[in-house]
Amino acid sequence: MSVVIGAMGFALLALTVLPAPALAYSMVAVIETQTQGPLACGNTARGLEGTQTLLGISDEILLPSAEGAGGGDPGGALQVRPVVVIKELDRCTPPLFLALVNRERIRLVEIRLFDRQGVHFFTIRLEDALVARISRQVRSHGLHEEVAFTYRAIQLIDERSGASASHQF
């Protein structure tokens, strides 16, 4: 049994841990709270200064079926799950923790997705949000935390075509 050490080993680990489609994208978030103001999250990449680098995101909005699983007419209210971002522990960890424990309103969470060439192609914008949950995990490839945001309004923007859709809950 051999142990691979160094950058090449990390690259191989990243390739085996992340699904192929995830490797094609990068993501950052701009976060502005009501009392703390814009969070300076430490990204130093040119044009992305102060943003939060993300490792992943997930969200879900469901329209339940009136007849339960398996079909039928849609019935009932939309079921909206929090948007969850995965990030490393960093300088934005304490302000997000304070936002959670103080129930601080978050004016804006703007998630920007970039393709493999670094072109900003999609934006998810949350307004009037709250940090609903923070969970931390220690894994073999590092320390990460999941931050779940509930929100009043969401906007989806295709930056290439200009198409957008929004909804208030």
Question: Where on the chain are the PLM-derived regions?
Answer:
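Bacterial N-terminal signal peptides
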Residues: V4-P19
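Glycine-rich, low-complexity intrinsically disordered segments
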Residues: P21-F169
